């Protein structure tokens, strides 16, 4: 079993921890708990770079090793890092579990060293008709991020 973790934070009181685990070549399970977010849906993605030198903006675009358009997690055409939305409760907190086959912790397309990003707005899953729908899901600014690090 390979395990990884990302600790999310920013200057706006958003905080939390996201854990990743993968058994063999199976899917990766993502579990997380976050606090300090506005209630409602927030886009949730793996971004290409593990660089936070300029805050979350330095994490680059969505992780997309296959050069596809943005989509929903269940779509065949999607970025590898497209994990859809998390639904934050009225108290500003969310706990979630996601299982995904496109974000391995080992191999050529490993997400280790990349970043996980929570966005300000809902991800339209590439179906919103906005000019940004097919690249970012029109999910708005980046409100929190963390670098995905390997755990022992």
From Swiss-Prot:
<comment type="function">
    <text>Destroys radicals which are normally produced within the cells and which are toxic to biological systems.</text>
</comment>
<dbReference type="InterPro" id="IPR018152">
    <property type="entry name" value="SOD_Cu/Zn_BS"/>
</dbReference>
<dbReference type="GO" id="GO:0005507">
    <property type="term" value="F:copper ion binding"/>
</dbReference>
<feature type="disulfide bond">
    <location>
        <begin position="56"/>
        <end position="145"/>
    </location>
</feature>
<keyword id="KW-0186">Copper</keyword>
<keyword id="KW-0479">Metal-binding</keyword>
<keyword id="KW-0560">Oxidoreductase</keyword>
<feature type="binding site">
    <location>
        <position position="70"/>
    </location>
    <ligand>
        <name>Zn(2+)</name>
    </ligand>
</feature>
<dbReference type="Pfam" id="PF00080">
    <property type="entry name" value="Sod_Cu"/>
</dbReference>
<dbReference type="InterPro" id="IPR001424">
    <property type="entry name" value="SOD_Cu_Zn_dom"/>
</dbReference>
<keyword id="KW-0862">Zinc</keyword>
<keyword id="KW-1015">Disulfide bond</keyword>
<feature type="binding site">
    <location>
        <position position="119"/>
    </location>
    <ligand>
        <name>Cu cation</name>
    </ligand>
</feature>
<feature type="binding site">
    <location>
        <position position="82"/>
    </location>
    <ligand>
        <name>Zn(2+)</name>
    </ligand>
</feature>
<comment type="similarity">
    <text>Belongs to the Cu-Zn superoxide dismutase family.</text>
</comment>
<feature type="binding site">
    <location>
        <position position="47"/>
    </location>
    <ligand>
        <name>Cu cation</name>
    </ligand>
</feature>
<dbReference type="InterPro" id="IPR024134">
    <property type="entry name" value="SOD_Cu/Zn_/chaperone"/>
</dbReference>
<comment type="subunit">
    <text>Homodimer.</text>
</comment>
<feature type="binding site">
    <location>
        <position position="45"/>
    </location>
    <ligand>
        <name>Cu cation</name>
    </ligand>
</feature>
<dbReference type="InterPro" id="IPR036423">
    <property type="entry name" value="SOD-like_Cu/Zn_dom_sf"/>
</dbReference>
<keyword id="KW-0049">Antioxidant</keyword>
<keyword id="KW-0963">Cytoplasm</keyword>
<dbReference type="GO" id="GO:0004784">
    <property type="term" value="F:superoxide dismutase activity"/>
</dbReference>
<feature type="binding site">
    <location>
        <position position="79"/>
    </location>
    <ligand>
        <name>Zn(2+)</name>
    </ligand>
</feature>
<feature type="binding site">
    <location>
        <position position="62"/>
    </location>
    <ligand>
        <name>Cu cation</name>
    </ligand>
</feature>
<protein>
    <recommendedName>
        <fullName>Superoxide dismutase [Cu-Zn]</fullName>
        <ecNumber>1.15.1.1</ecNumber>
    </recommendedName>
</protein>
<feature type="binding site">
    <location>
        <position position="62"/>
    </location>
    <ligand>
        <name>Zn(2+)</name>
    </ligand>
</feature>
<dbReference type="GO" id="GO:0005737">
    <property type="term" value="C:cytoplasm"/>
</dbReference>
